[in-house]
Amino acid sequence: RKNHQQNLLDRGGGCAACHLQTHTDSAHPALTVRVDNDRCFGCHSRSGRISLNYVGLAETEKYDQKNSANFGKLADGRLVKKLPLDVHSKAGMACIDCHTVRGVMGSGKRHEAQLDIQCTDCHAKKLFRKPLSQLQAREALYSALYPDNFHTAVNGSIIVSEKNGTPLFHLWEENGGRFLKGKISGKK
């Protein structure tokens, strides 16, 4: 057994890269679907660097000694400049609060544009819905595993992504308002 501490230098493969929880040498590892942002950061702070932007960092090669408080170094030695947090990060949301299982895990086929979620899936005037009776087995399994994140609304339907009809179990409308429950934090 090896201690599986996820950090910036980790770029694992397969299911364990994201779903293996941190454990001590004496504990048996456990799996989770509540994948925290550190798991995303190991891979997604490179190339597209979306994880850096999310937490208010930008990779740079220039260092301004007069404003040294605005700079830092990552564990792998890269120089970063501190910037404002992404609005979703500032609100305390996790990466998986927006990114769906279909967008992250895929459909088993290669796609040019794998991303499932769009801003309008939460922020459009009228959201897309799917009747609960039309949930696929994989989709129904998630609602069974995490019933606290499962919200229904109008006539037994669920809000879904426009692109692929992926259920957004943690998003609902109530009394004229729209709410999202954090998949990790559980906060509304």
Where do the protein language model's features map onto the residues?
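C-type cytochrome heme-c attachment and multiheme electron-transfer modules
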Residues: R1-T24, L31-K188
